[in-house]
Amino acid sequence: MSESNRLRIAIQKSGRLSKESMKLLRSCGVKFNINEQRLIAHSDNLPIDLLRVRDDDIPGLVMDGVVDLGIIGENVLEEEQIERERLDKPASCIKLRELDFGACRLSLAVPNEFNYEDASSLEGLRIATSYPNLLRRYMQRKGITYNDCMLKGSVEVAPRAGLADGICDLVSTGATLEANGLYETEVIYRSNACIIQSSEVQLPAKQALIEKILSRINGVVRAKESKYILLHAPTETLEQIVALLPGAENPTVLPLNDDTNRVAIHAVSTEDLFWDTMEELTKLGASSILVMPIEKMMG
């Protein structure tokens, strides 16, 4: 396949999305070897090039048509789109789907001694952030004026360093805020990782490959959310047992050798099978209950 037909995918070089992005692509059957000294990795089995770049470069690379796909946090994507619209630059891309990793929230936080009532408590104060556009949009909607302090990292130390009165930063568990004497006050944006596509993809072969990769991603994500359930059940309580299986659709029911009073049930559940459900199944006479993870799903 010619160089122009090779699919170019941008992912974060290092950081919280990097490992999960590579794990996802490998789960989709994309084989590649990463050389930490190189920014480009070529797939061994598919016409795909992997570009490892800074996360805040990914949206622009996709929007400008430099790469075809990007795996990025929704917060970074939204921040870049707002900035490009403000500068009247191309800001369109196709969001193919949200992914099941990279969950975080962009929140306002203030020092523990700060008497916070609502967002208006920040009127006229200085707020440190790496996401000035998302912060500005939120504060404008609230009708609050403030001064911003733009930092590319270590935002959480700004109040102690005397640089700002509060911060607007990404929060996962809140442990970093607590360690720096801060507490979370408002969530202004919730984010997951997502996969985006350039609006400029035109070659049929490349679009077909994108659809193949997306289908595999859908299968991997569905498999993570599903469990394969096997059990033996008395025929007299079969309907009750099937009704208890969460998210099960048309389970397979098979006869057991030399036992006309019991059957085997195989089912895919798209919900968690909790212990209390398993105990209810047991009360109805179910036995040999197995709940197993699924690696891949299709169809």
UniProtKB/Swiss-Prot annotation:
It is found in: Cytoplasm. Pathway: Amino-acid biosynthesis; L-histidine biosynthesis; L-histidine from 5-phospho-alpha-D-ribose 1-diphosphate: step 1/9. Its EC number is 2.4.2.17. It catalyses: 1-(5-phospho-beta-D-ribosyl)-ATP + diphosphate = 5-phospho-alpha-D-ribose 1-diphosphate + ATP. CDD domains: PBP2_HisGL2 (cd13592). Pfam families: HisG, HisG_C. Signal peptide: none annotated. The keyword Endoplasmic reticulum does not apply. It comes from the Bacteria. Its main location: cytoplasm. One of its GO terms (biological process) is L-histidine biosynthetic process. Its cofactor is Mg(2+). Keywords: Amino-acid biosynthesis, ATP-binding, Cytoplasm, Glycosyltransferase, Histidine biosynthesis, Magnesium, Metal-binding, Nucleotide-binding, Transferase. GO terms for cellular component: cytoplasm. Feedback inhibited by histidine. GO terms for molecular function: ATP binding; ATP phosphoribosyltransferase activity; magnesium ion binding. Catalyzes the condensation of ATP and 5-phosphoribose 1-diphosphate to form N'-(5'-phosphoribosyl)-ATP (PR-ATP). Has a crucial role in the pathway because the rate of histidine biosynthesis seems to be controlled primarily by regulation of HisG enzymatic activity. NCBIfam families: hisG, HisG_C-term. PANTHER family: ATP PHOSPHORIBOSYLTRANSFERASE, ATP PHOSPHORIBOSYLTRANSFERASE ATP-PRTASE. This is ATP phosphoribosyltransferase.
